[in-house]
């Protein structure tokens, strides 16, 4: 596994972008990183749900609002889609797996304080196979 190679190489941290293949494997690799003391950062909250230390991604509420504004401008005001500027965001949402955080010997409140200036919000989550599993508990 790639996770084994990263652990063997002694990396300080791992980042994986949003990728469904990696996310599917997360439940089988997150403990390898924890055992090695390696924080695993990812591009989506679903990875943190599956055991990664932290996921950081777009704030979907902000994205949806901005997208709706752009669509309304095109459909209602006749704006030309070809000249509608591309929008970017300078912050997002972080999701920290508190179980993994503790297993790595990190204090959640300290991690949260460090992340807050970079995010619209910092969420807490625990390891589960799906968001539905969390809602059932």
Feature names for model-found ranges:
Residues 2, 25-29, 63, 67, ...:
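Stable alpha-helical elements in mature extracytoplasmic
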Residues 73-137:
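Hinge/cleft segment of the Venus flytrap/periplasmic-binding protein
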Residues 58-79:
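Hydrophobic alpha-helical segments within soluble ligand-binding/sensing domains
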Residues 6-7, 32-34, 57-61:
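Short, hinge-like loop/turn segments at secondary-structure boundaries
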Residues 10-22, 41-43:
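Periplasmic-binding protein-like
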Residues 1-10:
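Extracellular/periplasmic Venus flytrap/periplasmic-binding protein
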Residues 25, 29-53:
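Venus flytrap/periplasmic-binding-protein-like
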Residues 1, 20-21, 44-46, 59-66, ...:
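Hinge/beta->alpha junction and helix N-cap segments in small-molecule ligand-binding domains
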């Amino acid at each position: 596994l790639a996770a084994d190679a990263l652990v063997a190489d002694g990396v300080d941290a791992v980042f994986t972008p949003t990728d469904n293949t990696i996310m599917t494997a997360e439940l089988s690799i997150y403990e390898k990183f924890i055992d090695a003391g390696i924080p695993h950062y990812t591009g989506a909250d679903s990875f943190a749900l599956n055991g990664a230390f932290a996921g950081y991604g777009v704030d979907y509420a902000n994205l949806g609002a901005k997208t709706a504004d752009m669509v309304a401008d095109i459909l209602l005001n006749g704006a030309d889609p070809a000249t509608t500027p591309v929008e970017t965001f300078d912050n997002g949402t972080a999701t920290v797996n508190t179980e993994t955080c503790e297993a790595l010997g990190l204090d959640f409140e300290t991690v949260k304080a460090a992340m807050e200036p970079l995010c619209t919000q910092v969420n807490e989550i625990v390891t589960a196979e799906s968001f539905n599993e969390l809602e059932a508990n």
